[in-house]
Amino acid sequence: MKSLILAEKPSVARDIADALQINQKRNGYFENNQYIVTWALGHLVTNATPEQYDKNLKEWRLEDLPIIPKYMKTVVIGKTSKQFKTVKALILDNKVKDIIIATDAGREGELVARLILDKVGNKKPIRRLWISSVTKKAIQQGFKNLKDGRQYNDLYYAALARSEADWIVGINATRALTTKYDAQLSLGRVQTPTIQLVNTRQQEINQFKPQQYFTLSLTVKGFDFQLESNQRYTNKETLEQMVNNLKNVDGKIKSVATKHKKSYPQSLYNLTDLQQDMYRRYKIGPKETLNTLQSLYERHKVVTYPRTDSNYLTTDMVDTMKERIQVTMATTYKDQARPLMSKTFSSKMSIFNNQKVSDHHAIIPTEVRPVMSDLSNRELKLYDMIVERFLEALMPPHEYDAITVTLEVAGHTFVLKENVTTVLGFKSIRQGESITEMQQPFSEGDEVKISKTNIREHETTPPEYFNEGSLLKAMENPQNFIQLKDKKYAQTLKQTGGIGTVATRADIIDKLFNMNAIESRDGKIKVTSKGKQILELAPEELTSPLLTAQWEEKLLLIERGKYQAKTFINEMKDFTKDVVNGIKNSDRKYKHDNLTTTECPTCGKFMIKVKTKNGQMLVCQDPSCKTKKNVQRKTNARCPNCKKKLTLFGKGKEAVYRCVCGHSETQAHMDQRMKSKSSGKVSRKEMKKYMNKNEGLDNNPFKDALKNLNL
């Protein structure tokens, strides 16, 4: 009898097979005399669509809403059905005694496995592999500590409740809005409050009125002393009068105070912090950061589990620190890391806190030494940031003397504040940091002359537009960006981690860009006309971050066994009925801001011009029609003059390729250019065909020369 291990992806299945020496490769799985390892391809099973309950629901009609099934159905995803059949056969195989779930250790990973097991009708015992890295050592250690699968039932119930609630609310709200206003509109419990966050910030900026104010400082021996009150004066004349009173008046140093202070390194990275920093430093978006991080985790195995919301480590990891530091010696931080090899680490250090780690600890390097030449430029940047933050967290604090010099002149007090570094501590990790010295020339009681008075004009600045990094942070802490009626609501938002989860926020932002609800101009995220109308047409409660936070709070309670999933789903059904009725009874109107005069060739309605990732297309305004045609799209064809990518306008014989430099050419000319470019060249396929044809011939010098090529 064997144990069947179910991984989430083929790459993880290979890692497990390698760690446990499961060497026999089969079609869709690995096997030895103790284990069988197979895999999902992400989700193999998903919620059924409305038309899979009732074929009449394929057409979107307002009168059919709300769609609330008595029992939720699941279906096998068509494009991965072959692998599902393999997994199903293995689960039901008589030689399999139990199932070991080895999908991602979290809510969604649990759902991936359990939906498959439920669809198959599994009755066999379940055990759970729960690890935060896929190194050989972590896998082997994890298999020594397998958990009873029943310990994770509540996690599964929470995942299932989240999935079903999103289906019930999302399907009905989107269909209701779309059919009511004859437009492609989408609502969701996470995406709609996110649009509201962006809109609120945009309104604050639009309504902001700058105010002018003035400050006063004095220059003494080359040092600037600021007026102690730090008051902003809106009346410049007040300061000018003060300056007149200071003319030809000497000052006196009232005190020189030195206070020794310490500053501590930032917390270790969780996913949101890392995504925010990658955007701030390199303008790399959250989705790209997560994909790169996933590659470092799965392919290279040099970082721990990416989708974590924790900034801390567990105390049982103390003994692994030296090994992790050792691998960082392969990076540009080797000189800074070397002293840490002789340091003793304690579980009392602030980075170790079991209470602040739920599913997964902070993102840190694994014990696998990276092959730096194998990493892409983006992977190198990301890995360096993780190493930098990790090493900083293990270093002693930065120490400095905070010096405050107080100056009195004509009854007014001015201060000079300077910091002098005494111990670099964690700041030694970053390049360019060094010990500083201040040769301040002041002593208590000194009489000093004022060499210059400075009245400076300032203007208050509006809040900044969100960018992809700061929007992530706002989703995590929406209570800092919106007005709430009650302080307890702010606490709810803080405790539940805000809108969405670390694993879903990047996808939500990406989706909002794709549906043209928000847009980014010069890195500034703004709500589009469509996004504003979605907020106006959506039920008010669905635009509030508080509602989704309250739902997330209940999901967490389900996860902890303190709330019934069935109760939560019933609440979502009642909420959905109210939402649909509200939309049905609304007298509001929707106005397409991108409607063209081009008629749809299928149904005759006017088409809408929409932006896509690679250009523009025309889409029928009727969602049930689904007719689309390209207006323009970027191609991989290059301009013969400047070598930039050409944009294609139109199609067929009428198509024209244009470049930003002004070059243009017809489809016929492009075809001719490509033909002449490729003429005389022999393809790899043709060379292989020639080799095979002449396999039995001797004394063929051309064939012998081709043998040395990697074909």
Curated annotation (Swiss-Prot):
Residue ranges occupied by any Topo IA-type catalytic domain in the UniProt entry: 152-580
Catalytic activity line of the entry: ATP-independent breakage of single-stranded DNA, followed by passage and rejoining
Keyword Isomerase among UniProt keywords: yes
Location of region: Interaction with DNA: 186-191
Residues annotated to bind Mg(2+): E8, D104
Active site: Y305 (o-(5'-phospho-dna)-tyrosine intermediate)
Residue(s) at site: Interaction with DNA: W60, W167, R175, R307
Keyword vocabulary terms for this entry: DNA-binding, Isomerase, Magnesium, Metal-binding, Topoisomerase
GO biological process: DNA recombination; DNA repair; DNA topological change
Cofactor: Mg(2+)
Domain Toprim per the UniProt entry, residue ranges: 2-135
Domain of life: Bacteria
Keyword DNA-binding: yes
Any GO MF annotation of the entry: magnesium ion binding
EC assignment: 5.6.2.1
Gene Ontology cellular-component terms listed: cytoplasmic replication fork
Chain residue ranges for the region called Disordered: 691-711
SUPFAM superfamilies: Prokaryotic type I DNA topoisomerase
Family that this chain belongs to: Belongs to the type IA topoisomerase family.
Role this protein plays: Releases the supercoiling and torsional tension of DNA, which is introduced during the DNA replication and transcription, by transiently cleaving and rejoining one strand of the DNA duplex. Introduces a single-strand break via transesterification at a target site in duplex DNA. The scissile phosphodiester is attacked by the catalytic tyrosine of the enzyme, resulting in the formation of a DNA-(5'-phosphotyrosyl)-enzyme intermediate and the expulsion of a 3'-OH DNA strand. The free DNA strand then undergoes passage around the unbroken strand, thus removing DNA supercoils.
Listed name of the protein: DNA topoisomerase 3
UniProt organism field: Staphylococcus aureus (strain NCTC 8325 / PS 47)
